[in-house]
Amino acid sequence: MRHRKSGRQLNRNSSHRQAMFRNMAGSLVRHEIIKTTLPKAKELRRVVEPLITLAKTDSVANRRLAFARTRDNEIVAKLFNELGPRFASRAGGYTRILKCGFRAGDNAPMAYIELVDRAESQAEVATAE
């Protein structure tokens, strides 16, 4: 029985899942918005939000913990130099999930996951108008 086992399996083994979410977390931190399937977005939120909370207090130990979870120094630098200070006054809820229809090939529900205080770039504003 699978009582009280949280998290989605997503038809992957544990190492594949861990690698996938490590890559997706890095992409989300780097680009601040990514498009993925809705179940992956909901699981990614459980990976990224603790990383941002960790980045709110800058210390060598926290940087090493973040590196152990992301395996990318560029991501760790952005977490602690930009995102940690940006979300210092926010107590959780750093990401937003926006549903965006269904994928053409297999009708999978798609979603954007983004950081809530993301700066709107000029290119996105121009395409919206």
UniProtKB/Swiss-Prot annotation:
One of its GO terms (molecular function) is structural constituent of ribosome. Keywords: Ribonucleoprotein, Ribosomal protein. The keyword Ribonucleoprotein applies. One of its GO terms (biological process) is translation. The keyword Transmembrane helix does not apply. InterPro entries: Ribosomal_bL17, Ribosomal_bL17_CS, Ribosomal_bL17_sf. HAMAP family: Ribosomal_bL17 (MF_01368). Belongs to the bacterial ribosomal protein bL17 family. Part of the 50S ribosomal subunit. Contacts protein L32. This is Large ribosomal subunit protein bL17. The gene is rplQ.
